[in-house]
Curated annotation (Swiss-Prot):
Family: Belongs to the aspartate/ornithine carbamoyltransferase superfamily. OTCase family.
EC number, as in UniProt: 2.1.3.3
Source species of the chain: Sulfurimonas denitrificans (strain ATCC 33889 / DSM 1251)
Classification lineage: Bacteria, Pseudomonadati, Campylobacterota, Epsilonproteobacteria, Campylobacterales
The protein's name in its UniProt record: Ornithine carbamoyltransferase
Main location, first listed in the record: cytoplasm
Gene Ontology molecular functions: amino acid binding; ornithine carbamoyltransferase activity
Length: 312
């Protein structure tokens, strides 16, 4: 085992330079793949993928990414392991980390992945929790870099104050750009996470604003983004949320208030006619699906970076 064990649980734990280094590694790997030059930088390594929440993009991107890097990915659902049947998190962590080289977890409570990481002997990656979705933000920022939009970012997030919103706040705080968040009353971001982001923003020069007015958030924005109004586990609230979020759909009228060259991002799956209109989604479909593909490349950059830290 090398000298340094780093986990990727939230962007809060990473410096600006580290985030940019991970992005750059991902971009280089993507470039190499497109030119049919694959470096097996994780040859013979095994990634354990624990899914307590199901996903299309997370499983496909991590499994494909590990294969392209020369390694193997092992899919584990609650039905496959004792973690879903009462075994203590700390026991599962010690067992799996003794057999695998890296672990990705997609789960509910953020405290669950924090406990797992505290007992793991190998890097743990947050594939999504109720509080954060940091791997998605790596892909989002990589996409902005590819489109030459990383300078003077003014980002607007319109919708639910959820894990995506929290991760956007951390990215803005770390990289020093402006982020405006618009949510309905009662669906604001977590106050503790907001205060943490604002504290970091003081050092980086970032500007983070929260409002209940979508127009205030979107005006002049260079990037507009949203997420589903009803996350996994909130299905019983769906009809109520649709009523409450009325006026928060990103449509052509809302996008017309953004900068003339503004781009729209969505982490997917997208529910057209709810958080985004069919017209806006299709108009920006090229960048959206490039953003989706970049989950693969950004996560490869992350896994390579985490592996290198063990050998410093």
């Amino acid at each position: 085992m090398g000298k340094l064990l780093r986990h990727f649980l939230t962007l809060r734990d990473f410096s600006k330079d580290e985030i940019l280094e991970i992005i750059n590694i991902g971009l280089e790997i993507k470039k190499s793949l497109k030119s049919a030059v694959c470096k097996h930088e994780l040859k013979n390594q095994t990634l354990a993928m624990i899914f307590e929440k199901s996903s299309t993009r997370t499983r496909v991107s991590f499994e494909t990414g590990m294969f392209q890097l020369g390694g193997h990915a092992l899919f584990l659902s609650n039905r496959d392991i004792h973690l879903g049947r009462g075994e203590p998190v700390k026991d599962t962590a010690r067992v799996i980390s003794g057999m695998c080289d890296m672990i990705m977890i997609r789960t509910f409570e953020h405290s669950r992945i924090e406990e797992f990481a505290s007992y793991s002997k190998v890097p743990v990656i947050n594939g999504l929790t109720d509080s954060y979705h940091p791997v998605q933000l790596l892909a989002d920022y990589m996409t902005l870099v590819e489109y030459g939009m990383e300078k003077n970012i003014i980002a607007a997030y319109v919708g639910d104050g959820n894990n995506m919103t929290h991760s956007w706040m951390m990215l803005a705080a770390k990289l020093g750009f402006e982020l405006r968040v618009a949510t309905p009353k009662g669906y604001e971001v977590d106050e503790k996470i907001l205060q943490e982001a604002l504290l970091i923003a003081k050092e980086s020069g970032a500007v983070i604003k929260v409002t209940n007015d979508p127009s205030e958030a979107v005006k002049g924005a260079t990037v507009v983004t949203t997420d589903t109004w009803t996350s996994m586990g909130q299905e019983e609230e769906k009809e109520a949320r649709i009523r409450i979020f009325n006026g928060f759909m990103v449509d052509e009228k809302m996008m017309s208030q953004a900068a003339s060259n503004a781009k729209f991002l969505h982490c997917l799956p997208a529910y057209r006619g709810l958080e985004v209109s069919e017209e806006v989604f299709e108009k920006h479909s090229e960048i959206i699906f490039n953003e989706a593909e970049n989950r693969l490349h950004a996560q490869k950059g992350l896994m390579v970076w985490l592996d290198k830290q063990r050998n410093i």
